[in-house]
């Protein structure tokens, strides 16, 4: 299975590396060339116990790649995770400009159906905005490609993020199409071997769990 993770901060880098660890072909994407150059040299922008060794191992096994090209990275990918920052806006709400810019860019460059998943911490109704931003680009291209949106909030504690991802006490996935559910179940299957539950729900409910 092949995925792309957009954003190489704490959430993106941990997500991408942990999926690579269970055999998924992962490309982590960032617009910051220096960050990508450093990652390709094994220099990480964050510290998480166990992360550096895991990155090195999966880069050597050619399961984990780093790139500045979203266009190249989503070719052949079945799932694209948005894990970019959502800095607080002037009124304190999450600024979604980076999330929606990624969605628009995916819409501009996608060549096959895929699932686009919000992993960043976002307010309820973000998935609908992602859908709209992506659809606008497809319409502009005159394309009728199918795509599915999903919400998959993270529950990673700083300093224990690898442990939290590899041995989750729960996995929350919000979908509104069976195709998206099937792909997300397939992707998370290795993490369910120890009986950890996966909760499949509608998208707004999944978006709410981070605030519950």
Predicted regions and their residues:
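Structural/interface elements that position substrates and couple domains in central-metabolism enzymes
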Residues: 1-212
